[in-house]
Each structure stands twice: as C-alpha cells, then as structure tokens.
A protein has these predicted regions:
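Domain-core and long-helix interface of multi-subunit machines
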Residues: 71-74, 78-178
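A metal-dependent hydrolase metal-coordination microenvironment
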Residues: 1-105
Length: 178
C-alpha cells in the first residue's frame, strides 16, 4: 500500500514515520520499478507482468498520488481508503470517540470525495473496509448509508472503473460483503 498522510516515502528528507518503534515507509518506488523491469524481462516468454500499486488515498493527499501516477507507467491501480483525517482504522484511532454513525458517515463521505476528484485508478478496492475494524455487531452500514454508497458507485461506473468484490469478509468472519 501507498498511504500518504500516514507514511512517508523512503527518500523523504523528514525520514520515516515510526509505529511502535518500527520505521514505516511507502514503497521504494525506484527499487520497485527496477525490480519490476528486471523480472518482466527475465520471464517475458513465460508470463505477462504488469506494473501496479494500491493507493490508499485521502482527499488531502490527491496531489501526491497524481505526482506518483505521472512518475511511473502504471498498468493497474487499486484505489482504497485506509485512513480518514490521517487516522488509521486498524489501530482504532479513527473510530475513537465517534459513534458508528459518525465514523461510517465520515468514511463514506471521504470515499465519495476521493472518487469524485481522483480519476487515475483502475478499480475501487474494498469499499467495505470499515466493517473489518468495526467491533460493534449489528450495525447495518449498507442500509444506513445506501444513498451515498449509491452515489459513489454511480461515479465509479460512469468513470468506467472496476469495483472490487473483496471476499476477505469470509476470513474475518463478517456477515456479508458490504
């Protein structure tokens, strides 16, 4: 994942961000691209290799993703939302102090704003990600937020993008895909 707002690039003059004492950074793009070209050439007669990444975009990081997209000849980009307001879902920081209604509303609004303003992607990834980190049982996020989810999907479809059906809900023992 590339997660601007949370992580910095390997060559960022400010250095890495630390989480629990461990440095975390985005992909080392020059090294990744060099390795991609090497493997693509080495196995050219056996496999077609495409260049891609998953962009964990937030509205305020769109310009950074635009620059990254222009810097490399990507074939495939998954657009995802992994944080809102630079707060991680998986740590619970984003949900802290908010009701389910509040954090789902803000999550879907961020997703809507991103798909409305960022177009350099191939597929919208796991738009149900919040369910994985929602420790409250029984909240019907789909029906409670159906209008904005519909608006998001209309934009994605109008733009000719794909929509990922992420089946990790089975692994995480969630009730449904949405």
């Amino acid at each position: 994942h590339v997660d601007y707002g949370i992580k910095r690039d390997v060559d960022d003059p400010l250095g890495p961000v630390y989480l629990n004492g461990q440095p975390i950074t985005n992909v080392d793009y020059p090294k990744y691209y060099k390795e991609y070209l090497y493997v693509k050439e080495k196995y050219k007669d056996q496999i077609t290799l495409k260049l891609g990444l998953e962009f964990g975009i937030q509205v305020h990081t769109i310009n950074q993703y635009e620059a990254l997209f222009k810097a490399y000849p990507f074939d495939f980009i998954i657009l995802s939302i992994h944080q809102v307001d630079d707060l991680e879902f998986w740590t619970g920081d984003y949900q802290k102090g908010r009701t389910e209604e509040e954090y789902y509303t803000r999550y879907y609004q961020e997703l809507y704003d991103v798909v409305k303003n960022y177009k350099n992607y191939s597929v919208l990834g796991h738009m149900d990600l919040m369910k994985r980190y929602d420790d409250h049982d029984g909240y019907d996020s789909f029906n409670k937020h159906k209008d904005i989810i519909t608006d998001i999907l209309k934009i994605v479809i109008k733009d000719g993008k794909g929509i990922e059906i992420n089946t990790s809900s089975v692994r995480y023992k969630l009730d449904d895909l949405m």
